[in-house]
Amino acid sequence: MMETPTDNIVSPFHNFGSSTQYSGTLSRTPNQIIELEKPSTLSPLSRGKKWTEKLARFQRSSAKKKRFSPSPISSSTFSFSPKSRVTSSNSSGNEDGNLMNTPSTVSTDYLPQHPHRTSSLPRPNSNLFHASNSNLSRANEPPRAENLSDNIPPKVAPFGYPIQRTSIKKSFLNASCTLCDEPISNRRKGEKIIELACGHLSHQECLIISFGTTSKADVRALFPFCTKCKKDTNKAVQCIPENDELKDILISDFLIHKIPDSELSITPQSRFPPYSPLLPPFGLSYTPVERQTIYSQAPSLNPNLILAAPPKERNQIPQKKSNYTFLHSPLGHRRIPSGANSILADTSVALSANDSISAVSNSVRAKDDETKTTLPLLRSYFIQILLNNFQEELQDWRIDGDYGLLRLVDKLMISKDGQRYIQCWCFLFEDAFVIAEVDNDVDVLEIRLKNLEVFTPIANLRMTTLEASVLKCTLNKQHCADLSDLYIVQNINSDESTTVQKWISGILNQDFVFNEDNITSTLPILPIIKNFSKDVGNGRHETSTFLGLINPNKVVEVGNVHDNDTVIIRRGFTLNSGECSRQSTVDSIQSVLTTISSILSLKREKPDNLAIILQIDFTKLKEEDSLIVVYNSLKALTIKFARLQFCFVDRNNYVLDYGSVLHKIDSLDSISNLKSKSSSTQFSPIWLKNTLYPENIHEHLGIVAVSNSNMEAKKSILFQDYRCFTSFGRRRPNELKIKVGYLNVDYSDKIDELVEASSWTFVLETLCYSFGLSFDEHDDDDEEDNDDSTDNELDNSSGSLSDAESTTTIHIDSPFDNENATANMVNDRNLLTEGEHSNIENLETVASSVQPALIPNIRFSLHSEEEGTNENENENDMPVLLLSDMDKGIDGITRRSSFSSLIESGNNNCPLHMDYI
């Protein structure tokens, strides 16, 4: 055949498919075989367009025809001139009839061969990624006709034809594992990504190592719970694979290679604890609060064998600062530091070893930087459930006074005959064991319990083990001399014994301390927890507070003092009925919490003088060193307050002694002799105020109430109202209420702010921190005032409840008795007690509107020489740099005051006393 010169011209519009000749069998599928004509003398553009139109018509018509078997001609290939080095059969595997051969398709003999790569990211199910289809045909290998049309799908469909998809594509690119919370793209070589029935994803290894112990009767129980479902919907959904075949493979592999229960160190609940639902913060950072379960390191208990050795005693463990807050041990086991006398010189009391050791196992020890649920909130939450269900059988103050602190609470199976078991909530106190049958515990805020039984005391409790997971306890029921037997198991038809072993350790050793991570292993924690950490401004937090919904209509906030985990402060908020009906939604809770504006803080304003009320229950002072601490604390306070007033009250609210500390507390016997003293004088704040301050309180007085007695409303001094001690010109008293010993019950609905200290040792430290006191050796009054100004402690105290700010107050003890004039000048906010209106000797003028911008808050008091001799100790306490500004302020006030003549005449006879508010 003759070639025309135009056949060798390569044009971008030229289609080689129209200029080729048959030289053998075609390498096309049957629907691609067409009759090609010889090239004509038309232009390359016309010939290419004509060939394309014919091919398109053929494709549309061939779709309607029935497929036929390949003929021998279908195996022939196109051949071109050797100079062109172009072939239509080597188009990167595009052998399908729906693909068009292009003139730029170069032979694969001259292309680099790239290795086959696999991505670590999961891909949608597709036949292209199957092992059977991984070997694609090469250009130099003739394709197999029986596999080309079926195994290799078209990559590009012709125009007008729908694309057939065999599966729904899912994008897992940004998904994370529900167990380890890491991106699913971070996986080991060959590790699979498992899609769960709930819609979340999990690594294969994460799911396998999370399998827990189970019995043959309940194989599905080995799958852990999905943390994302728990966090998003608050539902317990197991991580079960969506593929049933894969699920069966995992179960069979686990049962074949199952490890005995005694060899398992951790279970899915401890390794991947469910997150409690958290309330999103309002511009504040927070960390989800986790709950972990304690598991004893003792081996499984066999019948009639000796129990595993209890944990180490406290004196066997090195002392260190506590990483776990609000720990407690019975008072009988406490060891107060012998060097209590050193408290006069150094108020930075170190934590005792009893408060620094946690009983949690190292295998489940939480990280130190984790945000944790505070133990007081958990205690109040569980005790509130008891009180809500048994209001007639239980009294709140008796739980704290007679039962002691709550140590453990779990949901266990209880039987009295060893045959019939009932699901109960079990509460282990320091001196009581309480069980209550479960009626309904679906809603964590509406738990229903019934059939309460209290066993106390538990000092003579006898305990034996019948089987590996069955515990038998013999103990006395309350108000009954007969002994009762209780059989305790964790679950029926199960060999699990980790929770039972935890209870065995707690019963055998009263010093075994359970913190917020392991106080419960089977019950949900608080539904809402929020961190209100306050940044003071120098990189540290003053308090770390937590807010929890312990009742459908009660929110409690608990915080601890910076650098002292043994002192806590709490307050509560009651929600109205309209808000309670919408507690199921998080948005309604957020709207309620926005009303909480003041910051929970122990900071108070430094007073001029202090009055301290001590209610001591001597039956609870099992250590003689406690009286030494009380005596040393009072003597230490006299260094800062020479006119310190005291009042001792017994546990029945009767006055034992009162007066000045310098005059009456001269030795330790002054306090020890109060044990045998009795009195008929009932204590009340009104009586104490009229006794110590028969007239108005002219100075800035701080009132402190400390008690270690029972929290009975009619007998405890902490429930009484101390507003009568409000200093003149203030709206509320500068008070501080301290309870020695931690509480189970939350009394925040009756007490605005209550501080709980672990022992008498921390009472003085709490006072120093709250009122800004310091016992440095080279500290004097002038340095204190300068330090207060430079350190901006007046600004830091703005978070407290004290309202003495932004006003300049003038106190004048006038020699004139002008009732009408003085009554008109008294501020309307001042609260006057009955009988004080007839004899007013104090004149107060608030002049905040004329206060210069550079003048601090100053109180000016004009005293006579006879009355002011003892009250002018701080006459020269003012910084020298502010004297000129104060003089200007005084001149401005006197010019605008209607009593300027009175002040000018009084300056000649009476000295002017000035100090900071």
From Swiss-Prot:
<feature type="region of interest" description="Disordered">
    <location>
        <begin position="58"/>
        <end position="151"/>
    </location>
</feature>
<dbReference type="GO" id="GO:0005737">
    <property type="term" value="C:cytoplasm"/>
</dbReference>
<feature type="region of interest" description="Disordered">
    <location>
        <begin position="1"/>
        <end position="25"/>
    </location>
</feature>
<feature type="modified residue" description="Phosphoserine">
    <location>
        <position position="329"/>
    </location>
</feature>
<dbReference type="GO" id="GO:0005546">
    <property type="term" value="F:phosphatidylinositol-4,5-bisphosphate binding"/>
</dbReference>
<dbReference type="InterPro" id="IPR021106">
    <property type="entry name" value="Ste5_Fus3-bd_dom"/>
</dbReference>
<feature type="compositionally biased region" description="Low complexity">
    <location>
        <begin position="69"/>
        <end position="84"/>
    </location>
</feature>
<dbReference type="GO" id="GO:0019900">
    <property type="term" value="F:kinase binding"/>
</dbReference>
<comment type="function">
    <text>Component of the pheromone signal transduction pathway. It mediates pheromone signals acting between STE20 and STE11. It is absolutely required for pheromone-induced transcription of FUS1. May play a role in cell-cycle arrest in response to pheromone.</text>
</comment>
<dbReference type="InterPro" id="IPR038382">
    <property type="entry name" value="Ste5_C_sf"/>
</dbReference>
<feature type="region of interest" description="Disordered">
    <location>
        <begin position="778"/>
        <end position="821"/>
    </location>
</feature>
<dbReference type="GO" id="GO:0001403">
    <property type="term" value="P:invasive growth in response to glucose limitation"/>
</dbReference>
<feature type="compositionally biased region" description="Polar residues">
    <location>
        <begin position="799"/>
        <end position="821"/>
    </location>
</feature>
<dbReference type="Pfam" id="PF11610">
    <property type="entry name" value="Ste5"/>
</dbReference>
<feature type="compositionally biased region" description="Polar residues">
    <location>
        <begin position="118"/>
        <end position="138"/>
    </location>
</feature>
<protein>
    <recommendedName>
        <fullName>Protein STE5</fullName>
    </recommendedName>
</protein>
<dbReference type="GO" id="GO:0005634">
    <property type="term" value="C:nucleus"/>
</dbReference>
<dbReference type="GO" id="GO:0031681">
    <property type="term" value="F:G-protein beta-subunit binding"/>
</dbReference>
<keyword id="KW-0589">Pheromone response</keyword>
<dbReference type="GO" id="GO:0005078">
    <property type="term" value="F:MAP-kinase scaffold activity"/>
</dbReference>
<dbReference type="GO" id="GO:0000750">
    <property type="term" value="P:pheromone-dependent signal transduction involved in conjugation with cellular fusion"/>
</dbReference>
<feature type="compositionally biased region" description="Polar residues">
    <location>
        <begin position="16"/>
        <end position="25"/>
    </location>
</feature>
<dbReference type="InterPro" id="IPR021651">
    <property type="entry name" value="Ste5_Fus-binding"/>
</dbReference>
<keyword id="KW-0597">Phosphoprotein</keyword>
<feature type="compositionally biased region" description="Polar residues">
    <location>
        <begin position="85"/>
        <end position="110"/>
    </location>
</feature>
<dbReference type="GO" id="GO:0005886">
    <property type="term" value="C:plasma membrane"/>
</dbReference>
<dbReference type="GO" id="GO:0070867">
    <property type="term" value="C:mating projection tip membrane"/>
</dbReference>
<comment type="similarity">
    <text>To yeast FAR1.</text>
</comment>
<keyword id="KW-0963">Cytoplasm</keyword>
<dbReference type="GO" id="GO:0043332">
    <property type="term" value="C:mating projection tip"/>
</dbReference>
<feature type="compositionally biased region" description="Acidic residues">
    <location>
        <begin position="778"/>
        <end position="794"/>
    </location>
</feature>
<dbReference type="Pfam" id="PF12194">
    <property type="entry name" value="Ste5_C"/>
</dbReference>
<dbReference type="GO" id="GO:0043409">
    <property type="term" value="P:negative regulation of MAPK cascade"/>
</dbReference>
